[in-house]
């Protein structure tokens, strides 16, 4: 065992030496010096990644750090070489037929950059070694086998350096590699080195390509080239562009999995830039699970995954047209009204609808949505499909809804809130073929940004409970955010933090950020300290897709991918739609006071709808007459609904669950009910909720507590608070009601008084005596009619969750317990709003 351990250490040292040699020679090619400590890295971050079992997800990039705008960045001179007019990479990518047109020179969205390389590169070699040890040569090119054998045999740093020099000087012709591969002979070591350098370059794009993605529709963001993406750093020169390199085909995902072991450097660079530096920037290499990374890589790097056929593109066009014309119609009809329009991010609508259709195809029956005021009316009209005449009625201050018994809205169902805070619930046909019924529910929310987040999650959890959706497949939550709020509001982290907690897990949330690059009047550099507004989502290893808000197909694809991720892995995903806000914070606000340069650009900017219409006309998918006809059809429909709204009288509460039907209004009297329980039933319940299996070994003090409670229930004397509480819960459960209690340390009780959950002192197994009441009649899905759970150390988020849970069905007891009385003030927004 000691020998095996020392051998492993030796291999790791050899692998580390190989990586440092590669990096050192690459740095020499750029005439820039850097200490070994800076490159290799050390400390806790390295130790964290060394424990990672799979292929490294952090080879060419690491933490970003802020620098002064007027100061030199570390490595900026190297990045300048990448941007130089004579740079071979720039010409290579520009001349490639498979890439997009070269973008204008960008400028930093944030003053950050990634350091290049650290010791995680060793983890990459260790992963190759692990596969080699498990499978031998199966599915692996001989070149890797030879490399690992050399490392096992103690290859020296001098030998590695010599191999590098040969490769650097062009002494490794591909013909020799091909001949060796055909003959089954070992591939020359210099070919191995070149392959390794190319794989590091590929990994750099997977890690940091998003930094160079063209996601800003205004083109105002200037970005310095990340030095990790410069091929010269890896020792390649312009003469290597049309050379072929061996990359192998063994068990790789993405484009490297294609049956094409040899690639030219030009093709590789073209494919990488097209994939990672286009209108979508993918952040996923922070995810530690190899299966998840490989799944995403396969979706992202396979071009055939992203295409839309002619029919689907026409649908995207119509939905985009409806989004823009809805805002235009409201602007013309209600010139001075606040509506917090979606102009500048209209692609949200077709993208959101694409996610809903995909969800329906995957079996989703219910979608619970939470969102702020921005674009809310457009989502209500075009995604949820709330009747347009209802929306127009609310604009002109029409009559309030009336209840089933004819009571006025103010007494029963009406809301005094503004129209862009109201919710609704609509069932409609969705799916690719519009043949599946899906209920979409938008929760009402206050002006307090993000406060509705955990309320939505809680309602979703309750719906999953009552639908018996154990697999979390049919009920899903969707949360929309603003960029300033997503990075600024603490409730966002509280929501993310509870995403994988046992009694708060809802199978993942789809997060959509409407990133208009300004928070009311505040620029991003004054509202966050991170590179992206979405960086907080990395704490739960959620993938983040940054997408250009002018590219409707890219937005639709990102939404679809995020939805499929949620359904497959039951985890959160984030779509960051980088867009702009055409007007001020509201329509009567003047944005030129605070963002004059941005709004000069916005005034000249062509809308996404106009851009897409022009694109489809150019490609022959639509004619100019067809575009005009569709626009006229939509405007006519809006005008018809507007006329109908003049006589519209709402008849029901469309934002309230059907479970609440039949409840009395505040000014109605209900009959007095007997709340007492027969003493015989009390004793029976008391006996059951104090039973502990003989095979279970509770703590001796806990056993005394339960023995004392049994005596209380038998005699009816000296019943304390905790015993009375358990008896109350027990009688409700006995009648078939659902009881849920959560909060900090509620299972035991802050003062060690409750002990609703007890632990076996030998095995650690949990036992809940209250579940004795229905354990013999539990249904096939094991429904937990009684739930008690310790929460995260949060008040705001957890109370919001429990409030949302209580909204779905009034026939249940849902309790949040503040650990101490004044701790409730940390959740004051939920209490007040």
PLM regions with names:
Residues 2-29, 35-57, 61-63, 69-72, ...:
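Conserved internal helical-beta-strand scaffold that buttresses enzyme catalytic cores
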Residues 195, 552-559, 609:
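Amphipathic alpha-helical transducer elements in NTP-driven molecular machines
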Residues 579:
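Flexible glycine-/small-residue-rich
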Residues 595-596, 600-601:
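Glycine-rich loop/linker segments at domain edges
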Residues 546, 554, 559-567, 572, ...:
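C-terminal catalytic or substrate-handling cores of phosphate/nucleotide-
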Residues 518-520, 554, 582-583:
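Short gly/pro/ser/thr-enriched loop/turn and capping motifs at secondary-structure boundaries
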């Amino acid at each position: 065992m000691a020998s095996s351990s020392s051998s492993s250490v030796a291999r790791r040292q050899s692998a580390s030496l190989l990586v440092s040699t590669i990096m050192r020679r690459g740095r020499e090619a750029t005439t820039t010096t850097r200490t070994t400590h800076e490159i290799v890295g050390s400390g806790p971050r390295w130790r964290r990644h060394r424990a990672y079992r799979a292929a490294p997800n952090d080879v060419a990039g690491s933490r970003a750090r802020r620098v002064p705008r007027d100061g030199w960045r570390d490595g900026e001179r190297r990045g300048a070489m990448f941007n130089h007019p004579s740079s071979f990479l720039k010409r290579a990518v520009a001349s490639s037929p498979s890439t997009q047109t070269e973008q204008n020179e960008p400028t930093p969205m944030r003053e950050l950059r990634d350091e290049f390389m650290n010791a995680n590169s060793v983890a990459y070699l260790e992963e190759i070694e692990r596969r080699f040890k498990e499978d031998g040569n199966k599915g692996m090119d001989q070149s890797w086998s030879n490399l690992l054998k050399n490392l096992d045999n103690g290859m020296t740093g001098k030998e590695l350096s010599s191999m590098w020099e040969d490769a650097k000087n062009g002494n490794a012709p591909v013909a020799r590699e091909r001949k060796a591969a055909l003959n089954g002979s070992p591939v020359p070591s210099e070919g191995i080195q070149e392959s390794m350098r190319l794989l590091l370059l590929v990994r750099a794009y997977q890690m940091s390509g998003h930094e160079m993605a063209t996601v800003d529709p205004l083109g105002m963001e200037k970005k310095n080239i990340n030095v990790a993406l410069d091929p010269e750093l890896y020792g390649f020169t312009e003469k290597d562009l049309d050379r072929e390199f061996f990359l192998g085909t063994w068990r790789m995902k993405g484009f490297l999995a294609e049956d094409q072991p040899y690639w030219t450097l030009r093709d590789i660079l073209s494919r990488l830039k097209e994939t990672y530096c286009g209108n979508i920037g993918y952040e996923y290499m922070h995810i530690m699970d190899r299966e998840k990374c490989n799944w995403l890589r396969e979706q992202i790097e396979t071009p055939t995954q992203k295409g839309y056929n002619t029919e689907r593109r026409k649908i995207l066009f119509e939905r985009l047209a409806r989004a823009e014309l809805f805002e235009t119609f409201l602007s013309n009809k209600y010139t001075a009204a606040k509506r917090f329009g979606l102009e500048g991010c209209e692609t949200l609508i077709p993208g959101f609808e694409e996610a809903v259709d995909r969800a329906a195809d995957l079996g989703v029956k219910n979608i619970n949505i939470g969102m702020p005021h921005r674009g809310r009316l457009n989502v209500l009209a075009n995604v949820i499909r709330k009747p347009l005449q209802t929306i127009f009625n609310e604009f002109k201050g029409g009559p309030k809804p009336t209840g089933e018994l004819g009571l006025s809205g103010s007494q029963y169902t009406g809301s005094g809130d503004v129209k862009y805070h109201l919710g609704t619930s609509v069932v409609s046909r969705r799916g690719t073929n519009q043949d599946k019924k899906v209920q979409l529910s938008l929760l009402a929310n206050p002006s307090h940004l993000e406060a509705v987040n955990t309320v939505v999650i809680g309602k979703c959890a309750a719906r999953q409970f009552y639908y018996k959706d154990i697999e979390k497949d049919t009920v899903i939550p969707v949360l929309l955010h603003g960029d300033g709020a997503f990075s600024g509001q603490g409730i966002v982290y509280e929501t993310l933090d509870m995403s994988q907690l046992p009694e708060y897990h809802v199978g993942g949330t789809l997060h959509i950020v409407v990133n208009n690059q300004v928070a009311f009047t505040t620029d991003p550099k004054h509202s966050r300290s991170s590179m992206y507004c979405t960086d907080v989502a990395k704490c739960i290893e959620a993938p983040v897709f940054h997408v250009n808000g002018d590219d409707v197909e890219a937005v639709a694809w990102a939404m679809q991918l995020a939805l499929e991720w949620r359904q497959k892995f039951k985890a959160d995903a984030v779509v960051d739609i980088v867009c702009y806000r055409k007007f001020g914070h509201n329509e009567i606000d003047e944005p030129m006071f605070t963002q004059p340069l941005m709004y000069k650009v916005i005034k000249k900017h062509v809308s996404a709808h106009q851009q897409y219409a022009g694109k489809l006309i150019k490609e022959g998918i639509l004619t100019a007459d067809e575009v005009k006809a569709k626009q006229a059809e939509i405007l006519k429909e809006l005008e018809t609904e507007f006329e109908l709204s003049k006589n519209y009288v709402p008849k029901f509460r469309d934002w309230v669950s059907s479970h609440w039907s039949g409840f009395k209004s505040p000014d109605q009297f209900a009959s007095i009910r007997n709340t007492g329980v027969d003493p015989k039933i009390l004793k029976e319940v008391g006996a059951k909720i104090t039973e502990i299996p003989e095979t279970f070994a509770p703590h001796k003090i806990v056993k005394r507590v339960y023995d004392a409670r049994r005596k209380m229930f038998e005699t009816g004397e000296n019943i304390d608070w905790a015993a009375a509480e358990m008896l109350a819960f027990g009688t409700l459960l006995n009648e078939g009601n659902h009881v849920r209690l959560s909060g900090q340390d509620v299972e035991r009780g802050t003062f060690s008084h409750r002990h609703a959950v007890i632990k076996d002192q030998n095995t650690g197994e949990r036992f809940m005596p209250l579940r004795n009441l229905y354990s013999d009649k539990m249904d096939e899905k094991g429904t937990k009619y009684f739930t008690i759970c310790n929460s995260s150390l949060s008040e705001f988020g957890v109370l919001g969750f429990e409030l949302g849970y209580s909204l779905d069905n009034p026939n249940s007891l849902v309790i949040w317990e503040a650990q101490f009385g004044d701790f409730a003030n940390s959740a004051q927004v939920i209490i007040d709003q």
